[in-house]
């Protein structure tokens, strides 16, 4: 199976469009890409890079370097690299929702997304907290954020919260949903028959038997015991300061961190260029780059396409595996 994937560049004034141009310089055998984007922005990116780009109709086939099928989502005003315009917020959101709807309808099999500038979207009058939340709301599901590179996968029990709010946000129902979502995704999309998940403690030393916090004793341990009784292979709660040692990581398929900066610094240190962001729990695979819009680099031809390349390759793999698991 050769999955059909939506490719969404993200912020038109950032590096997303030029990364898409670089991506299609090698024809892909693992998937067919359909860009949801402003055609003029893609052409400008190709010109800035001095690379070939042939925008094709949706029913065409990409055969040579630079071929890219496009479903046009025009900007409201012309975009200029390095200068994000809130007037184009509607086009950015429209491209994301269009890609999501194409997957929900069964037309496409997955979505690969470039970086979006949250502040610019909100300045454009659209309440927006992130693409993860946008696509989850569209699909009517609760999702889990996972980041991954070639060394480790890290799922998050909470995402973008102030540290003072994290403990209150971790509840037994919420943590159970997260673990079930991660477990199901590892089976369905990664093809792991019996995934092993390491669960980090919230507190230093995983609470030190209640002396450094009781969340582990009162909430995490009882939940893990109950889910283990159902057959889930869960290890923990583990002290976060030693859980990422290579010898320990080798025994886990995924690590569940309780908050953003507990799990992600190690992942990004171990391979930021190859890191990608996955949304687990959607009816289709969505994989995003793990970097921002980099307005200061846009149009200069120096942005690294590694994360977008990794995201596209992984999304194609997940889409194929999901079909096999159906």
Curated annotation (Swiss-Prot):
Pathway: Cofactor biosynthesis; pyridoxine 5'-phosphate biosynthesis; pyridoxine 5'-phosphate from D-erythrose 4-phosphate: step 4/5. Binds 1 divalent metal cation per subunit. Can use ions such as Zn(2+), Mg(2+) or Co(2+). Its cofactor is Zn(2+); Mg(2+); Co(2+). It is found in: Cytoplasm. It comes from the Bacteria. Pfam families: PdxA (PF04166). It catalyses: 4-(phosphooxy)-L-threonine + NAD(+) = 3-amino-2-oxopropyl phosphate + CO2 + NADH. One of its GO terms (molecular function) is 4-hydroxythreonine-4-phosphate dehydrogenase activity. The active site is located at the dimer interface. Homodimer. Belongs to the PdxA family. Catalyzes the NAD(P)-dependent oxidation of 4-(phosphooxy)-L-threonine (HTP) into 2-amino-3-oxo-4-(phosphooxy)butyric acid which spontaneously decarboxylates to form 3-amino-2-oxopropyl phosphate (AHAP). HAMAP family: PdxA (MF_00536). This is 4-hydroxythreonine-4-phosphate dehydrogenase. It comes from Stenotrophomonas maltophilia (strain R551-3). The gene is pdxA.
